[in-house]
Amino acid sequence: MIRKANINDAKDIVKVNVMGWKNTYKNVFPQTFLDELDPEDENSIRKCQEKINQYAVCEIDNKIVAMIRYGRNKKSYDDSYAEIYALYVDDSYKKQGIGSKLVEFAFEELRKEYDYVLISTLVDNSANEFYKKIGGKFVGNCDFLLGNDKFVENMYEYLLK
């Protein structure tokens, strides 16, 4: 079931997010950085609770198996643009349409206030094919900084209205 997240979901959202990072970015980001990511980190859980209105989740058998975070675009001053900040699906539940359903849920929410959505993902991320498949138009690259390391992301644009 896809639904808006509530404050009680924060711990599970952080867990899905951290496991998503560890699985997706293995051999991409420094392993020491990934090893430090803690799914039980109280600070991360608190931050998630503070922004819980930006999250939706997929719950199956009372377990959060996927999450999406969305809101105003942080990369642009154009108020007509929203952004998908994060989308992670537990590896055991991938290739079942959950990611597509979460994106569509977020688009419906964002359509109320915005005309466009941007999604950025690392150029080497296998998710690039997914974002193209669901209608993303490649609009350029942007830099992503992680500590002192710079990575390049592809940006995809979606028309909401």
Show the residue positions of the predicted features.
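Acetyl-CoA-dependent GNAT
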Residues: 4-10, 15-28, 32-91, 103-105, ...
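Glycine-rich phosphate-binding loop
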Residues: 93-96
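Conserved active-site alpha-helix within GNAT-family acetyltransferase domains
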Residues: 100, 124-140
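Conserved GNAT acetyl-CoA-binding A-motif
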Residues: 110-122
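Short proline/glycine-enriched turn/loop segments at secondary-structure junctions
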Residues: 143-149
